[in-house]
């Protein structure tokens, strides 16, 4: 594994890289559709998450058998329901005295499925929101309410961003401020809020926005991203700049770069039915997902810690992993020392208030070499559940024109791999 964010050539997707992106997208999409079919009333989120990871392991082992590069899960399967935003992936720890204490899906649950796969560091991530419904019955209506507003907003926002990326050309460059504005406008029209953690960012080999290595790009000034932190974090950044107009500072920062042909981009938009001051760590659920911070080193005291770190370096790379996927229970004894020394960073289960509903859409795309109104979507776009919002895109607005008025051919990969 080599991380070199300063290498500008690594940003242009060549034929070899394209094949790895394509295969990662095809296989993670195939796994996703099988996982989604299991999201039915009464289903165990632990069993669904485990099933998704098993599929990813099976699929990644089915190709590139003679190649000696890294391949594996880039994001463990998580099943986040209603007000849960990120990182709920219950494992063996949720089984107590033979009872599965993980959350079991119920009718009406707004359920976000997230997973990812990589080959040689070329990554495809996907998230999609579905509504858990009972078996179809005559006269069954759509899902309605604030959750439906959030689902519609996330759907149209991800579509609008994809359309903008597809129409990029040198005469009308797509900048970060344009991408941010269209997402914020759609949230406003559906009377919802963009959830902290949402992002639109350029990705490259091994670099998909992991917090532990994100600063490598920041240090090299090669990070091209639109991010939605919590409101208080945006205020803090504005205070640091001592600006009288924080919006102008943000706009200036986002206009220093623009989208280029043959780049890989991650679109990850979450919408909240209510404004969120911040996401909070779940008070009772311990993290099951961890990520190795390659920037931190320490002379470990415990043999179990050294053994565990060796396994992680060999098998997990720089991507998040589920602690249940570690091979040896003995090695798990070293988990505490690795986290205490910040070599492993836990990814807590993040939630908002119980009355809130969050919807998420995430897809990975590659811009085409010419401004041909084509975009290659590595993860197969999935239509939203049967929902109905009281709101819609307002006629004549940029959001409506971009979503519905631009003739964009979003090409999908073939998932029959």
From Swiss-Prot:
Q: What class of enzyme is it?
A: hydrolase
| Subcellular compartments | Cytoplasm; Nucleus
Name one matching Pfam family.
Peptidase_M24
Q: Which GO terms describe its biological process?
A: proteolysis; ribosomal large subunit biogenesis
* Key word Repeat present: no
Q: Which domain of life is it from?
A: Eukaryota
Query: Which Enzyme Commission numbers does its entry carry?
Result: 3.-.-.-
Q: Name one GO molecular function term.
A: metallopeptidase activity
Task: Show the SUPFAM superfamilies listed in the entry.
Answer: Creatinase/aminopeptidase, Winged helix' DNA-binding domain
Q: What does this protein do?
A: Probable metalloprotease involved in proper assembly of pre-ribosomal particles during the biogenesis of the 60S ribosomal subunit. Accompanies the pre-60S particles to the cytoplasm.
Q: What family does this belong to?
A: Belongs to the peptidase M24 family.
Q: Which PANTHER family match?
A: METALLOPROTEASE ARX1-RELATED, PROTEASE FAMILY M24 METHIONYL AMINOPEPTIDASE, AMINOPEPTIDASE P
What is this protein identified as? Probable metalloprotease arx1
Q: Which organism is it from?
A: Schizosaccharomyces pombe (strain 972 / ATCC 24843)
This protein's encoding gene? arx1
């Amino acid at each position: 594994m080599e991380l070199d964010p300063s290498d500008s050539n690594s940003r242009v997707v060549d034929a070899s890289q394209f094949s790895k992106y394509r295969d990662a997208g095809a296989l993670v999409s195939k796994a996703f559709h099988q996982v989604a079919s299991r999201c039915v009333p009464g289903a165990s989120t632990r069993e669904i998450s485990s099933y998704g990871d098993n599929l990813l392991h099976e699929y990644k082992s089915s190709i590139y058998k003679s190649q000696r590069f890294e391949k594996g899960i880039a994001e463990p399967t998580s099943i986040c329901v209603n007000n849960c935003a990120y990182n709920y992936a219950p494992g063996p720890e949720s089984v107590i005295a033979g009872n599965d204490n993980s959350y079991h899906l119920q009718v009406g649950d707004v359920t976000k499925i997230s997973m990812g796969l990589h080959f040689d560091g070329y990554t495809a991530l996907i998230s999609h929101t579905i509504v858990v419904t009972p078996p179809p019955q005559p006269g069954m209506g759509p899902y309605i309410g604030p959750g439906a507003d959030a689902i519609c907003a996330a759907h149209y926002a991800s579509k609008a961003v994809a359309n903008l990326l597809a129409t990029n050309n040198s005469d009308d460059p797509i900048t970060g401020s344009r991408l941010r504005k269209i997402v914020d406008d759609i949230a406003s029209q559906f009377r919802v809020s963009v959830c902290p953690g949402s992002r639109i960012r350029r990705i490259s080999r091994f670099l998909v926005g992991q917090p532990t290595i994100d600063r490598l790009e920041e240090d090299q000034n090669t990070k091209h991203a639109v991010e939605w932190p919590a409101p208080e974090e945006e205020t803090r950044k504005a205070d640091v700049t001592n600006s009288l107009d924080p919006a102008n500072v943000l706009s200036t920062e986002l206009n220093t770069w623009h989208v280029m042909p043959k780049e890989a981009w991650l679109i990850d938009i979450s919408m909240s039915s209510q404004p969120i001051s911040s996401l909070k760590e779940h008070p009772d659920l311990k993290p099951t997902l961890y990520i190795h911070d390659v920037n931190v080193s320490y002379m470990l005291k415990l043999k179990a810690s050294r053994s565990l770190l060796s396994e992680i370096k060999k098998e997990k790379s720089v991507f998040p992993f589920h602690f249940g996927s570690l091979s040896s229970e003995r090695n798990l004894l070293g988990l505490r020392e690795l986290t205490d020394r910040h070599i492993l960073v836990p990814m807590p289960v993040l939630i908002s208030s119980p009355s809130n509903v969050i919807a998420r859409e995430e897809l990975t795309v590659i811009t085409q070499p010419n401004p041909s109104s084509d975009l290659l979507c590595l993860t197969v776009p999935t239509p939203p559940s049967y929902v109905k919002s009281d709101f819609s895109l307002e006629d004549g607005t940029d959001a409506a024109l971009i979503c519905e008025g631009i003739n964009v051919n979003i090409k999908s990969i073939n998932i029959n791999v």
